[in-house]
Structures are given as structure tokens and as C-alpha cells.
Amino acid sequence: PTPTGSSAASDVYKRQIREGMTLCGQARTVSVTHGDNSAIHAALTIINKGEILVVEGGGFTDRAVWGELMSLSSIHIGLGGVVIDGAIRDLGDLKKMDLPLFASGRTAAGPTKGGGGSVDIPISCGNVSLKPGDIIIGDDDGVAVIPFEIQNQILLSSEKKIIYEKEIIKKIKDGNTHKDIFDIKDIPIVNDDN
């Protein structure tokens, strides 16, 4: 689990391609035009090791903007992971690769390369706004965006949340009930067996 401890960490749900992988790093943002991955190619020439490529694809899933070749390049570069608000292809190959990858969908249809899109601009991914440099965290539960400006505040909040959850786990293992742990008031239980 990735406890962020704050609602300031906006959730961007995207399906993980290979379970068990995590990502954490600063966002490098790309906006693509419908089905055109030219801007992603441009971003891959300037992205730094460990950064997370976040692609605003408008949620379109009828043309893939990512596939096996880009994943191979990303692994070679040392990318920290990829989040795409759009479709990928070559799923069988991507599942075998050691690259954290989250996407909205998949399709067999490949991209166009018409030269559209932009790199390093504020974008919206899954209805969550983010900027280059924001912190991206992802695991089996999905992806969260932490604005760069409040990363230290979120880190402290997350540390407190982890300590709190460890205390709860200990109480559960010691045999305490949820009612006692969380100070739940008596709730009437309706019995429909009449």
C-alpha cells in the first residue's frame, strides 16, 4: 500500500500492466494529440533517469501511443515508469518487461506520427491536473500525484499514517475488535429473519 496520508495527493486511477511493480519519481509530462505519439518520442530524447513519463492522451483507447519499442528504450534510459491516459499495445511483451507501466486501455491499432503534442507542460491525466516535477507514486492500487510544492508536508503526513497503521495492525493481532480500536458507537443491526 502507498499511504499518502492526505487528500492533497490526488488519485489518478490507471490499470497497471504488470502487477507487483511500483513507481515513484518526478513527472516529465507529455500531451499528445489523438493517437499521435510524436511528442512521446521527443520526450524520450530529453528525459532523465528515474523520472516518470506521464502522458495526457485524452483517455482515447482506439489508437495506442505506447508499445514494445518505446518500453525497450525507456528501460535503456532508466525511466522510473510510465503513466498513460490512453492506450498501449504489445501487451504480452510489455508484461515481461521490468518497467512500471500504467495505462487506460489497450488496442491493436498503432499510433500516427503527425508531429502533434507538447512536452513539459501542465497536463490533466485521469481528470487530475499535474505539472512537470510533481511527484508520481504508483502501485497495484493505482497512481497518485503529489504536487511538488507540498511534497514535504505529504511525506510527514505519510510517515504518521504508516506509524498509525502499524499500531492498528498490532491491536488487531492482539485480538482487539474493530469496534474497540476505532471507537465505533453501537449501530443497530436489523434482523430480517422474521
Describe the residue ranges of each PLM region.
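Translation machinery proteins
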Residues: 11-39
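Single conserved hydrophobic/aromatic residue that forms the stacking wall/gate
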Residues: 1-5, 9, 13
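Extracellular/luminal Protease-associated
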Residues: 43-86
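Acidic, glycine-rich flexible loop/linker segments
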Residues: 104-181
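Short coil/turn connectors at secondary-structure junctions
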Residues: 24-26, 48-51, 77-80, 96-99, ...
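Conserved, helical-rich catalytic subdomain that frames metal- and/or nucleotide-binding sites
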Residues: 176-193
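General beta-strand structural signal in soluble alpha/beta enzymes
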Residues: 11, 32, 54-56, 82-86, ...
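Histidine/lysine/aspartate-rich catalytic loop segments that bind and position anionic ligands
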Residues: 89-106
